[in-house]
Regions:
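Structural element of the ATP-grasp superfamily
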Residues: 2-3, 151, 218
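Short, flexible loop segments at the rims of nucleotide/cofactor-binding pockets, characterized by
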Residues: 35-41
Length: 266
């Protein structure tokens, strides 16, 4: 419906497992990470930009920032009755939000524009009262409430404007790759032997078969996190021993959450 509204063509991408694994490997190399959630979600963007490049598109618009600016994440609903806490958490998101689309766009030489991240628009969005960003409709609680209301005049708006929030990996189907790793990639014995070896030798905690595959792929390109001098700072992640350089609650290298960084004394 949205493509028709703007006179554009809607393209559906179908990706086989081996193709997805190649995409994930490139994401790991580009972003120096083996964080499963980041890899799955960023692979969605990678696949979309890659397809756009293949069909001759040179510029794309993204919705980056919408969830952060307008309280779109599902977990924020727990703060609905505590507006000061909701506002505090949304402001925290403003300070830590980062998106892979720019890096991926540069890789494919596709210009990425994110209207929500325009400085003037962000100032406007941040000035909107928090009570307008989360609200109730048809006995349900919704984030990005004011954005959804903007589409009420559209035909079939119920189907699109009031669509449930899903992570990119869920809405795209990329999350199904987890089953592949669990059932086809490693035997239980191989998995247990590998995670022990990696923990003992490289000081990295592996949490799943998927995580193991991503780490082994990461090691094709990079040293263990603790051996990368540029990552050694005052704080380090307790799960991977990599440098922890930001104010978020998870490690951007291994995906550990929640993280209490270790203060290094040497």
């Amino acid at each position: 419906m949205i493509a028709k509204q703007y006179g554009s063509k809607h393209i559906t991408i179908k990706i086989k497992t081996l193709e997805l694994l190649k995409i994930e490997e490139k994401v790991i190399e580009l972003f120096r990470t083996f964080d499963p959630i980041f890899i799955r979600n960023s692979s969605v963007i990678f696949a979309a930009v890659q397809k756009a490049k293949d069909v001759g598109v040179s510029a794309l618009l993204t919705g980056d920032g919408g969830d952060e600016l307008f309280a779109g994440y599902n977990y924020l609903k727990r703060y609905f009755k505590d507006k000061p806490k909701l506002e505090e958490e949304v402001k925290r998101l403003w300070n830590i939000m980062h998106f892979p689309s720019g890096t991926i766009g540069k890789f494919f030489n596709v210009k990425i524009t994110s209207p929500y991240l325009d400085e003037k628009f962000m100032r406007f969005a941040k000035s909107i009262n928090i009570s307008m960003k989360m609200g109730q409709y048809q006995n349900k609680l919704w984030g990005k409430f004011i954005l959804r209301k903007c589409f009420e005049k559209w035909q079939h708006h119920e189907k699109h404007a009031w669509r449930e929030k899903e992570a990119q990996e869920e809405g795209s189907g990329f999350s199904k790759i987890k089953d592949y790793f669990e059932n086809q990639m490693f035997t239980n014995k191989e998995f247990l032997n590998e995670i022990k070896r990696i923990k003992d030798i490289e000081s990295v905690k592996i949490r799943s078969k998927e995580h193991l595959f991503y780490y082994l792929t990461y090691r094709k390109y990079f040293l263990p996190p603790r051996s990368q001098k540029e990552l050694l700072e005052l704080r380090k992640c307790p799960d991977c021993s990599g440098g922890f350089r930001w104010i978020g609650k998870f490690c951007r290298i291994c995906g550990a959450y929640p993280v209490t960084p270790i203060i290094q004394t040497e």
